[in-house]
Amino acid sequence: MAEQESLEFGKADFVLMDTVSMPEFMANLRLRFEKGRIYTFIGEVVVSVNPYKVLNIYGRDTVEQYKGRELYERPPHLFAIADAAYKAMKRRSKDTCIMISGESGAGKTEASKYIMQYIAAITNPSQRAEIERVKNMLLKSNCVLEAFGNAKTNRNDNSSRFGKYMDINFDFKGDPIGGHINNYLLEKSRVIVQQPGERSFHSFYQLLQGGSEQMLHSLHLQKSLSSYNYIRVGAQLKSSINDAAEFKVVADAMKVIGFKPEEIQTVYKILAVILHLGNLKFIVDGDTPLIENGKVVSVIAELLSTKADMVEKALLYRTVATGRDIIDKQHTEQEASYGRDAFAKAIYERLFCWIVTRINDIIEVKNYDTTIHGKNTVIGVLDIYGFEIFDNNSFEQFCINYCNEKLQQLFIQLVLKQEQEEYQREGIPWKHIDYFNNQIIVDLVEQQHKGIIAILDDACMNVGKVTDGMFLEALNSKLGKHGHFSSRKTCASDKILEFDRDFRIRHYAGDVVYSAIGFIDKNKDTLFQDFKRLMYNSSNPVLKNMWPEGKLSITEVTKRPLTAATLFKNSMIALVDNLASKEPYYVRCIKPNDKKSPQIFDDERCRHQVEYLGLLENVRVRRAGFAFRQTYEKFLHRYKMISEFTWPNHDLPSDKEAVKKLIERCGFQDDVAYGKSKIFIRTPRTLFTLEELRAQMLVRVVLFLQKVWRGTLARMRYKRTKAALTIIRYYRRYKVKSYIHEVARRFHGVKNMRDYGKHVKWPTPPKVLRRFEEALQSIFNRWRASQLIKTIPASDLPQVRAKVAAMEMLKGQRADLGLQRAWEGNYLASKPDTPQTSGTFVPVANELKRKDKYMNVLFSCHVRKVNRFSKVEDRAIFVTDRHLYKMDPTKQYKVMKTIPLYNLTGLSVSNGKDQLVVFHTKDNKDLIVCLFSKQPTHESRIGELVGVLVNHFKSEKRHLQVNVTNPVQCSLHGKKCTVSVETRLNQPQPDFTKNRSGFILSVPGN
């Protein structure tokens, strides 16, 4: 039941009326209309009264109020029924449909648009781009179909002149993924003629009023509506629709949907062709038919992308094949006009069907695999023409009203008849409620061999000239005694009916008088093959594809096509079967008055609609019946988690007993009845409470399942990880063993090799052993080095260590380190180097040893020295393990300067073959010298000096910084300067010269 509104608005649900009577029903309907409450429930059926004004009840805030809510939680609204259909589809994976019914002008088309907008608004919360694209196209398709399929009538400014059923496809998440549109019986006769006060289809007026001057010029059109015969009748009529604005809306919608520019242009050309066809005038010159305004033919040919003479021939002649002979039969003026009008109607119908097909191609569900994406469910929305009674009712009204009879029959079957029969079949106590079953009227129209459609088809198939009067006579003879059929012949006193013209059908919605004139022609729907060939031979591929049957040979014999009435009957039967397979939801639309006024509520007019829609009977069945029924098995499958007696499985004798236990556990036993195979629930509130309990339990069930499943996944992951680690461990062990074995094999016996295995190539280690390999190679290299060292005499070891130190510090930075010769170290005491003065130096060295108590002599050599005053002198350096002495060899090696080794911070040498060396001191009084030897001359001693000093410092666990650079940076008494080295030819010995930045050491060249 609906949420209770204030009493000033009446009853929100007709089921809540104190007494079920027509006066009370009408009083409540009037009160709610006058208070602006246009929607009222009958249980789960929405009764909608057309307000004839814009109401602010469809915005985003209203959508949020109804989203996910149950019917009884909010006041009556279209959104409530749309949400109910959506929830049923999503919860139970069941196809649903929303059937909107009512007579023309009752608001069906607007209702369908609001339902579509609501479904679009509540879906795709994650804003997936593809879903948004589909939703946008589904919504945009409405305005395109309205432009080409709707028209202004005396009862409705936007009347649907075709039937539309749209299936919206949803994925398992409940998001729209596509759709499909079925269209039924376009009223194409409106293209060429309209009743007074009515217009043709909106598309013509939109093109003329909204098209640009350039576009209209290219189509040979002008904005004046009265210039075109086919639409002149409605040219001066006022409409609530802004044609110019709607033209742009429709054009934009076609682009959004996916129509190509050339397709849109072809659509405009077809509309222009129809308007030009209406202006063609035929005259007869003797026996020859002619077109009075021949220029129009050229325009039509240009727009159809064909030749003017072909267009003219198709309009004036008809090609007839008799055996092998082909004859061009001239038309009379009347036949030419008939052919032109038939051509115009056919072109428009093909255009409309092509638009629907094109939209379907674009919005159809693509690449959807149910095994991957889950079940594809559907919500169908039926917006079809309402019941029509005009001053002049023809073939179109006959088909439309037959359609409404079929839909009313479906409503009776599902809501009134089947429901009561099901109660009796299930053994539920029930008092039968009488209702009018319109099956007799449906049979009157569609029954095989006896119905009106069968009689009409028989008349159309007769050989010779068959008139509408002959068809009416056949109706009189075969249906004259039928209770719902009458004519002037069967009711001679009824002067409303014209002789040989009218017949009356007593429909469920009231009596309708039909004029038989035009029935035969409209049922045959004749279009000469010449026009089909003309269109097929167009150079415009869009037009060509619209007329595939035009490719047939002139002499080819084709099967007689089904008549328009039979095609419509078959489509209605298929539609009803489709709707019957879905769970239905109803919107019953009521037209409050015929003046389109928002203030007038015509009691008599509304009462008549309430009666023929069977709304009062609907209330009675709803009050006495049950809102929901389900088989015990399915009910238990959905709600068994609510009770501990049924979860996860019950041990009771039957599913029925288990359902009883569950219902009693929840305390709903007074609101249900138990049938033979189904449970019946009276009020929606009980069902919604069950859904709430289920939703609460589902959280716990899902959490439990998640816990179990996550635990299972964790255990599986742990086992897989453990197994993988075991495999990795054993594999690594295997690789390590293999590597060790291979190393052992390759290096077996290296102790007996001359190079102790230097040439042996190491095997590639596993990634995990790369650091181990480095350590192993280091150990091997140490061992090999130790083996090599064992062969060196103990007296040579200091020299070897010094050479190693020199290599570490200078290798790759200086060309000649003097490694190939023996290092003497104390060259001043060597007779070959200083034959005259060596005897003088030795006593000085001994005295210094006594005085300074040094242990070892590290290095001594003659040098050339430069001081801060740029004075160059021959000197000698004497390096012990404690001091560096600068001596004057000309004064019997007198000590000129003593530098403690702890005051020495580093050495700088050049990267050439020269013997430049700078001793850096802590007090920034660097010593700049160039080593030189007398025998042999130019011997390189830099490597030896660096090696012995670095080795000595290392033995004392101190670091000596050695720089290799050119020029060399130094400091003389705190002043920064540089010493660069240059090679000069004809230079007898190294010499220093002054420059701007410091000094230049010139050394002899080759």
UniProtKB/Swiss-Prot annotation:
<keyword id="KW-0007">Acetylation</keyword>
<protein>
    <recommendedName>
        <fullName>Unconventional myosin-Id</fullName>
    </recommendedName>
</protein>
<dbReference type="InterPro" id="IPR010926">
    <property type="entry name" value="Myosin_TH1"/>
</dbReference>
<comment type="similarity">
    <text>Belongs to the TRAFAC class myosin-kinesin ATPase superfamily. Myosin family.</text>
</comment>
<dbReference type="InterPro" id="IPR000048">
    <property type="entry name" value="IQ_motif_EF-hand-BS"/>
</dbReference>
<keyword id="KW-0067">ATP-binding</keyword>
<dbReference type="GO" id="GO:0019904">
    <property type="term" value="F:protein domain specific binding"/>
</dbReference>
<keyword id="KW-0597">Phosphoprotein</keyword>
<keyword id="KW-1003">Cell membrane</keyword>
<keyword id="KW-0967">Endosome</keyword>
<dbReference type="GO" id="GO:0005524">
    <property type="term" value="F:ATP binding"/>
</dbReference>
<dbReference type="GO" id="GO:0051641">
    <property type="term" value="P:cellular localization"/>
</dbReference>
<dbReference type="GO" id="GO:0051015">
    <property type="term" value="F:actin filament binding"/>
</dbReference>
<dbReference type="GO" id="GO:0043204">
    <property type="term" value="C:perikaryon"/>
</dbReference>
<dbReference type="GO" id="GO:0005768">
    <property type="term" value="C:endosome"/>
</dbReference>
<dbReference type="GO" id="GO:0005938">
    <property type="term" value="C:cell cortex"/>
</dbReference>
<feature type="modified residue" description="Phosphoserine">
    <location>
        <position position="200"/>
    </location>
</feature>
<dbReference type="GO" id="GO:0061502">
    <property type="term" value="P:early endosome to recycling endosome transport"/>
</dbReference>
<feature type="domain" description="IQ 1">
    <location>
        <begin position="699"/>
        <end position="719"/>
    </location>
</feature>
<dbReference type="GO" id="GO:0000146">
    <property type="term" value="F:microfilament motor activity"/>
</dbReference>
<dbReference type="InterPro" id="IPR036961">
    <property type="entry name" value="Kinesin_motor_dom_sf"/>
</dbReference>
<keyword id="KW-0472">Membrane</keyword>
<feature type="domain" description="IQ 2">
    <location>
        <begin position="721"/>
        <end position="741"/>
    </location>
</feature>
<dbReference type="GO" id="GO:0015031">
    <property type="term" value="P:protein transport"/>
</dbReference>
<keyword id="KW-0677">Repeat</keyword>
<feature type="domain" description="TH1">
    <location>
        <begin position="812"/>
        <end position="1005"/>
    </location>
</feature>
<dbReference type="GO" id="GO:0030424">
    <property type="term" value="C:axon"/>
</dbReference>
<keyword id="KW-0505">Motor protein</keyword>
<dbReference type="Pfam" id="PF00612">
    <property type="entry name" value="IQ"/>
</dbReference>
<dbReference type="GO" id="GO:0016459">
    <property type="term" value="C:myosin complex"/>
</dbReference>
<dbReference type="GO" id="GO:0031410">
    <property type="term" value="C:cytoplasmic vesicle"/>
</dbReference>
<keyword id="KW-0966">Cell projection</keyword>
<dbReference type="GO" id="GO:0005516">
    <property type="term" value="F:calmodulin binding"/>
</dbReference>
<keyword id="KW-0009">Actin-binding</keyword>
<keyword id="KW-0653">Protein transport</keyword>
<feature type="binding site">
    <location>
        <begin position="102"/>
        <end position="109"/>
    </location>
    <ligand>
        <name>ATP</name>
    </ligand>
</feature>
<dbReference type="GO" id="GO:0016323">
    <property type="term" value="C:basolateral plasma membrane"/>
</dbReference>
<keyword id="KW-0963">Cytoplasm</keyword>
<dbReference type="GO" id="GO:0005769">
    <property type="term" value="C:early endosome"/>
</dbReference>
<comment type="function">
    <text>Unconventional myosin that functions as actin-based motor protein with ATPase activity. Plays a role in endosomal protein trafficking, and especially in the transfer of cargo proteins from early to recycling endosomes. Required for normal planar cell polarity in ciliated tracheal cells, for normal rotational polarity of cilia, and for coordinated, unidirectional ciliary movement in the trachea. Required for normal, polarized cilia organization in brain ependymal epithelial cells.</text>
</comment>
<feature type="domain" description="Myosin motor">
    <location>
        <begin position="9"/>
        <end position="695"/>
    </location>
</feature>
<feature type="modified residue" description="Phosphotyrosine">
    <location>
        <position position="536"/>
    </location>
</feature>
